[in-house]
Swiss-Prot record:
GO molecular function list: mannitol 2-dehydrogenase activity; mannitol dehydrogenase activity
Chemical reaction(s) catalysed: D-mannitol + NAD(+) = D-fructose + NADH + H(+)
Binding site for NAD(+): 37-48
Entry EC number(s): 1.1.1.67
Function: Catalyzes the NAD(H)-dependent interconversion of D-fructose and D-mannitol in the mannitol metabolic pathway.
Catalytic class of the enzyme: oxidoreductase
Name used for this protein in its record: Mannitol 2-dehydrogenase
InterPro entries cross-referenced by the UniProt entry: 6-PGluconate_DH-like_C_sf, 6PGD_dom2, Mannitol_DH, Mannitol_DH/Oxidoreductase, Mannitol_DH_C, Mannitol_DH_N, NAD(P)-bd_dom_sf
Keyword Ion transport attached: no
Organism for this UniProt entry: Emericella nidulans (strain FGSC A4 / ATCC 38163 / CBS 112.46 / NRRL 194 / M139) (Aspergillus nidulans)
Length: 502
């Protein structure tokens, strides 16, 4: 039997053919619900995270006021618009684990607006009274945030275009759209909508607020003041491993579940979301579907610190050394027993002692869960994906733990091994002599420093925007990282790693 095309009329047949391994939406859609959320940036992570939480609220708790209207701002988003439109805005989330696979057809995205076709329609949608939340997954570059000055990159041509009052109905950037819609609500006497960042950034809500208020001040100080007083921008921590969809995933969905979906999402069973309870125009009852809704930024930051230092730090440990060792996927690295022991000991002995205690959170269990997630052979999470843009990761995920360990005279040699592996990775050649590509906005400067420094860390550490000044003067740190660099250069990752395992 050929696979069934994913659309509304085929849902019953898809469910019947699924033999208990498929879920489909049975809740009202289209005109029977209100689109209370407008989401900018409908990619894999959004469709595996926020859209799934909303799907569960609609399916299990009768929520009808918070369906999602997706928005695409870039030409790349046309493909997503076309595929979702052809499937009645339905898509499949494939959860994979060592225990098997499960397919969930998600219907929480109710419509999709492609901004290049009609920018005014997007502004009007966001300004509509039914819109309570505008959520974002626009990646770091979409925030026009200068990490050195912590200010809006106001000189960017697209920001300059959006600051021109003549272009208010045809904005280009997220902040141009947000401002135009909020200005319209201001003039209509409505409340502002909540702006909810779902990007994997520290203080994502605070950054969003500062960037939008900065934009608005340049445009209209009165509206900027209104946004400052009445607008809410909750901070959040998000987590779900979501690799890019491959052609093989589309084929497997058709073969294993009988569903023809042109752009499914593949992910793991685990997902997490901690969000500050800071909304100005209502919100869904997120607590009912497992979201941790907390009272303030400090509570978010405690969860975030666990994730950044343990999950993201471990990803860094797996990625750069794993690529040097010739591995392709995350789970392959974890199949090496020495590597698995290294990861566990780094988390338990060097990172865990630095973390705050959170009521109800068992750090040991969290670490075990991470090892299980990383070991999942069905996700096929590629190392190049987690190695992307390391200049924004190592200074966040590894170096702060080293600095804190030095401060409390704790151990940090394994963390130094991770940093040394990244320094070596910058040469773009693995331990067998095979070249690989590196994607990093600072690549030219980093590679020049790596080449000039040789087997000494001083040149790379001289980049103050990444490393500051403190570590460069610590003799213990310099000795540990230099030793690791020299051992990796001489013996390679796999022969060096046993020296870092007890």
């Amino acid at each position: 039997m050929p696979p069934l095309k994913l659309n509304s009329k085929n849902l019953a047949a898809i469910l019947n053919a699924g033999k208990g391994q498929i879920k489909v939406p049975t809740y009202p859609r289209n005109g029977a619900v209100k689109e209370g959320i407008v989401h900018i940036g409908v990619g894999g992570f959004h469709r595996a995270h926020l859209a799934v939480y909303i799907d569960r609220l609609m399916q299990n708790h009768g929520v009808t006021d918070y369906a999602i209207a997706g928005v695409g701002l870039t030409p790349f988003d046309k493909k997503m618009r076309d595929i979702l439109r052809s499937q009645d805005h339905l898509y499949t989330v494939i959860e994979r684990s060592a225990k098997g696979s499960f397919a969930n057809v998600v219907g929480s995205i109710n419509s999709f607006l492609f901004a290049p076709d009609d920018r005014e329609a997007v502004v009007a949608k966001m300004a509509h009274p039914d819109t309570h939340i505008v959520s974002l997954t626009i990646t770091e570059s979409g925030y026009y945030y200068n990490e050195n000055t912590h200010e809006l990159v106001s000189e960017h041509p697209d920001i300059q275009f959006d600051l021109d009052p003549a272009n208010e109905k045809t904005p280009r950037t997220t902040f141009g759209f947000l401002y135009a819609a909020l200005a319209r609500r201001f003039k209509q006497g409505l409340n502002p909508f909540t702006v909810m960042s779902c990007d994997n950034m520290q203080k994502n809500g605070a950054i969003t607020r500062h960037m939008l208020e900065s934009f608005a001040r340049l445009r209209n100080p009165e509206i900027a003041e209104w946004i400052s007083k009445k607008g809410h921008f909750p901070n959040a921590m998000v987590d779900r491993i979501t690799p890019q969809t491959a052609p093989a995933d589309i084929t497997a969905l058709a073969n294993d579940f009988g569903i023809q979906d042109d752009w499914p999402v593949v992910t793991e069973p685990f997902m997490d979301w901690v969000i500050e309870d800071h909304f100005c125009d209502g919100r869904p009852p997120f607590e009912k579907v497992g979201v941790k809704v907390v009272k303030d930024l400090r509570a978010v930051e405690e969860y975030e610190k666990h994730k950044l230092r343990l999950l993201n730090g471990s990803h860094s440990a797996i990625g750069y050394a794993g690529q040097l060792a010739g591995f392709q996927y995350v789970h392959e690295v974890l199949q090496n027993d020495t590597y698995k022991k290294f990861l566990w000991q780094m988390m338990q002995e060097e990172v865990k002692p630095l973390l705050p205690e959170i009521p109800g959170v068992d750090i040991d269990e969290y670490c075990r869960t991470l090892i299980e997630r990383f070991s999942n052979p069905t996700i096929k999470d590629q190392l190049p994906r987690i190695c992307l843009n390391a200049s924004g990761k190592i200074p966040q995920f590894i170096m702060p733990s080293i600095a804190e360990a030095i401060w409390v005279t704790g151990p940090f040699r394994r963390l130094c091994f991770v940093a040394a592996a990244w320094f070596r990775y910058l040469h773009g050649v693995d331990d067998a002599g095979n070249k690989f590509d590196i994607e990093d906005p600072m690549l030219e400067e980093l590679q020049a420093k790596a080449k000039a420094g040789g087997l000494e860390p001083h040149e790379i550490l001289s980049i103050k925007s990444l490393f500051g000044d403190d570590l460069r003067g610590d003799k213990r740190f310099l000795q540990e990282i230099t030793t690791a660099m020299q051992l990796i250069d001489r013996d390679g990752v796999l022969k060096t790693m046993p020296k870092y395992v007890d």
